[in-house]
C-alpha cells in the first residue's frame, strides 16, 4: 500500500508541478499579449492624437483665413461705399450749380463738341428753368452757320446736365453719365487719395 501511496503521491505532485508550469506559461503569455495590446493601443492613441492635432491646426488656419478674407471684403465694401458717396456728392453738387455755372457748362460742352448743329437740347425740370430760348439763340450764333440747336419740349428724367438728341441718337451729357465715366477712369485715384 505504501507503494501505491507513493505512486499516487508522485502522480499528484507531478500533476501539481505541470499545473504550475502550465499556469506560469499561460500567465507569461497573457502578460505578453496584454503588453503587446497596450503598446499597440498607445501607438494608435499617439496616431489619433497627432491626427486630431493636425486637423485642429488645419481647422484653426481655415477659420483664421476665412475671418481675414471676410475682414478684407468688409473693408473693401466700406471703401467702395465711401467712393460711391464721393461720386454721389459730386453729382449733387453739380446739380446745385448756379444758373450761370450751368449755362457755362452747357455752352462749353456744345461749343467743344463736333456737332451737326441741328440737335435737340433735352433738359430736366431744373435745367428748363435756367436755359431759355434766348440762351439757345445766343448759342446758335456762336456755333455759326450750322447752328440750329432747338430746345426740346421733352423733359428729361435725370438729375442734371443735358442730352443732345438727333434722329433718335443721344449724346448723353447728364451729370450722372459724366460722373459715371469719371468713376471708371478715376476710381483708383480717388481711392488712393481717400485711403492713403
UniProtKB/Swiss-Prot annotation:
One of its GO terms (biological process) is proton motive force-driven plasma membrane ATP synthesis. It comes from the Bacteria. The keyword Transport applies. Keywords: ATP synthesis, Hydrogen ion transport, Ion transport, Transport. InterPro entries: ATPase_V1_Esu. One of its GO terms (cellular component) is proton-transporting two-sector ATPase complex, catalytic domain. GO terms for molecular function: ATP binding; proton-transporting ATP synthase activity, rotational mechanism; proton-transporting ATPase activity, rotational mechanism. Belongs to the V-ATPase E subunit family. Produces ATP from ADP in the presence of a proton gradient across the membrane. This is V-type proton ATPase subunit E. It comes from Clostridium botulinum (strain Eklund 17B / Type B).
Amino acid at each position: 500500500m505504501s507503494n501505491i501511496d507513493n505512486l499516487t503521491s508522485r502522480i499528484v505532485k507531478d500533476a501539481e508541478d505541470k499545473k504550475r508550469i502550465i499556469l506560469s506559461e499561460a500567465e507569461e503569455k497573457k502578460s505578453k499579449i496584454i503588453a503587446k495590446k497596450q503598446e499597440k493601443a498607445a501607438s494608435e492613441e499617439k496616431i489619433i492624437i497627432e491626427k486630431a492635432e493636425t486637423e485642429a491646426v488645419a481647422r484653426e488656419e481655415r477659420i483664421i483665413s476665412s475671418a481675414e478674407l471676410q475682414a478684407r471684403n468688409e473693408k473693401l465694401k466700406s471703401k467702395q461705399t465711401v467712393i460711391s458717396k464721393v461720386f454721389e456728392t459730386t453729382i449733387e453738387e453739380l446739380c446745385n450749380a448756379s444758373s450761370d455755372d450751368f449755362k457755362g457748362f452747357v455752352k462749353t460742352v456744345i461749343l467743344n463738341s463736333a456737332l451737326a448743329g441741328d440737335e435737340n437740347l433735352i433738359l430736366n425740370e431744373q435745367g428748363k428753368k435756367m436755359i431759355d430760348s434766348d440762351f439757345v439763340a445766343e448759342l446758335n450764333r456762336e456755333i455759326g452757320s450750322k447752328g440750329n440747336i432747338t430746345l426740346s419740349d421733352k423733359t428729361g428724367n435725370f438729375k442734371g446736365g443735358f442730352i443732345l438728341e438727333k434722329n433718335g441718337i443721344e449724346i448723353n451729357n447728364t451729370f450722372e453719365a459724366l460722373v459715371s465715366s469719371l468713376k471708371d477712369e478715376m476710381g483708383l485715384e480717388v481711392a488712393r487719395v481717400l485711403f492713403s
